[in-house]
Amino acid sequence: MSVTRGSAGDLRKGSYVILDDEPCEVLEVSKSKPGKHGSAKVRVEARGIFDGARRSKIFPADALVEIPIVDKKTAQVINVYGNVVQLMDLETYETFELPLPEDPELASRLKSGIEVEYWESMGKRKIVRTRGGV
């Protein structure tokens, strides 16, 4: 699994964290001051990268959290058929299939020969945007 560990107190908006075994992008972080008996707490609001679900969790500020490694790669669309997009990675020349993105605007721009950016983390992949000003 492509993860590292980091302190919950170091999380920032826009960083990534694993919540409920799902890689998530941090939307908001709020910290509470330590009391007389107890450590500071960090409340993390995040959205799943692949499923879009919002998640919230509270950690002690010094707790270790898992941070996913999100690889941002480029691929070329080979074919679009039905609800499936066939892609070829431009570095490894590996071909693979992904479901058509849920965003109708992005899905309408996917044509054979177009380059796209896709994210890969924890064995999952997702088309994020088209490349090259299209």
From Swiss-Prot:
Pfam families: eIF-5a (PF01287), IF5A-like_N (PF21485). Gene3D superfamilies: 2.30.30.30, Nucleic acid-binding proteins. GO terms for cellular component: cytoplasm. Transmembrane segments: none annotated. InterPro entries: IF5A-like, IF5A-like_N, NA-bd_OB-fold, Rib_uL2_dom2, Trans_elong_IF5A_hypusine_site, Transl_elong_IF5A_arc, Transl_elong_IF5A_C, Translation_prot_SH3-like_sf. Keywords: Cytoplasm, Hypusine, Initiation factor, Protein biosynthesis. It is found in: Cytoplasm. GO terms for biological process: positive regulation of translational elongation; positive regulation of translational termination; translational elongation. The keyword Cytoplasm applies. The keyword Ribonucleoprotein does not apply. GO terms for molecular function: ribosome binding; RNA binding; translation elongation factor activity; translation initiation factor activity. Belongs to the eIF-5A family. Functions by promoting the formation of the first peptide bond. This is Translation initiation factor 5A.
